Design a protein with these regions (language model features):
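C-terminal beta-strand edge segments of enzyme domains
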Residues: 13-30, 224-280
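A structure-centric signal for secondary-structure junctions around beta-strands
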Residues: 2-3, 33, 75, 134, ...
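Residue-level detector of flexible, active-site-proximal loop/helix-junction positions
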Residues: 10, 128, 153, 257, ...
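Active-site-proximal beta-strand elements of phosphoester/diester hydrolases
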Residues: 1-18, 23-59, 136, 148-150, ...
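Hydrophobic pocket-lining residues within nucleotide cofactor-binding pockets
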Residues: 8, 85, 154
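Cys-nucleophile CN-hydrolase/nitrilase-fold catalytic domain and related Cys-dependent amidase chemistry
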Residues: 56-149, 211-249, 255-258
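Active-site catalytic loop in hydrolytic enzyme cores
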Residues: 20-21, 28-30, 107, 128-203, ...
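Structural motif
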Residues: 5, 78-80, 122, 178, ...
Length: 280
């Protein structure tokens, strides 16, 4: 989750302006509705499918349909969910007491994954530990589950009261990095306290719940609206492509909660090419 909250040091006062530098670095294709979308793939990467849903029930309907349509001899696909998909219908502050619900939902996905054994389900979920709760991505394949990544950049006080920020990158030596929401902003920041992308990263798959106020009564710079919502995303993407010249593509799978009627910011951003040559 990425909160538009006043007082956070990521130049929120600039986000209402139309970004100009991004057009020089990347092209973007929007998928502004929930459902399944199939981005154009980088040739060397695992085929990726975005599964955008605003509720757990909607997500399960979509992923069950994907399983029913999935041919047994199909090459491996990676199905990406939004951030915290297993608790999409649960208030953020209630997540610490919902471990049984989360475990049950993950178990259902593990069972479902056996019907599509070569597929990888990347699911946003709380990860419960004695030392805290991580905002994590797990990867489920043929009935087994492992942690793929944990969120490293936590801006809002509401999230800080629920989740522990990870100080370790779980993925090492990977050309395609999975990221959780505000980590997109963190990776693009030019400050030492924010994490940096590994040098071999060529693509990012980001699971998001984007630009959403996280606590009642908070003093936000402004409530999310369509212009601010999209310009925040494009600014973050522009910083990534500017800072990391090796980065070729970013895929965002998003959801939005009931507090907004703005559709999700599912998108695929690719570094521009000139006469077939990728710009640097």
């Amino acid at each position: 989750m990425f909160a538009l909250q006043a007082g956070i040091s990521y130049d929120i006062f600039m986000y209402h302006k139309r970004p100009r530098e991004q057009a020089r670095h990347y092209d973007i294709q929007w998928h502004r509705q929930t459902g399944v979308f199939y981005p154009e793939q980088l040739s060397s990467e695992t085929p990726t499918v975005g599964v955008s849903a605003n509720t757990w029930r909607e997500y399960m309907d979509l992923i069950r349909q994907a399983a029913a349509d999935y041919p047994a001899d199909h090459p491996a696909d990676r199905f990406i969910s939004p951030e915290l998909m297993t608790t999409a219908d649960i208030d953020l502050l209630e997540i610490p007491g919902q471990r049984d619900v989360v475990d049950d939902r993950l178990a259902k996905l593990e069972e479902l994954s056996t019907s599509m054994p070569t597929a990888e389900l990347v699911v946003g979920t709380p990860e419960y530990h004695p030392d805290g709760i991580y905002n994590s991505l797990v990867i489920i394949k043929n009935g087994t589950r492992r942690v793929l990544e944990r969120k490293r950049t936590i801006f809002s006080s509401a999230e800080q009261g629920t989740f522990t920020a990870s100080n370790t990158l779980q993925q090492q030596c990977t050309r395609t990095l999975s990221a959780v929401c505000a980590d997109l902003v963190g990776y693009g920041m030019q400050y030492p306290q924010y994490p940096k992308l590994p040098q071999d990263t060529r693509a990012i798959h980001a699971s998001c719940c984007w630009a959403t106020p996280l606590e009642e009564g908070a003093h936000y710079a402004a409530a999310p609206d369509e212009e601010r919502y999209t310009s925040t995303m494009t600014r973050a993407l522009g910083r990534l492509f500017e800072r990391y010249r090796q980065l070729r593509q970013v895929i965002v799978v998003d959801r939005t909660p009931p507090s907004t009627t703005i559709p999700p910011l599912n998108c695929v951003a690719r570094r521009k090419t000139h006469n077939g040559i990728i710009e640097s």
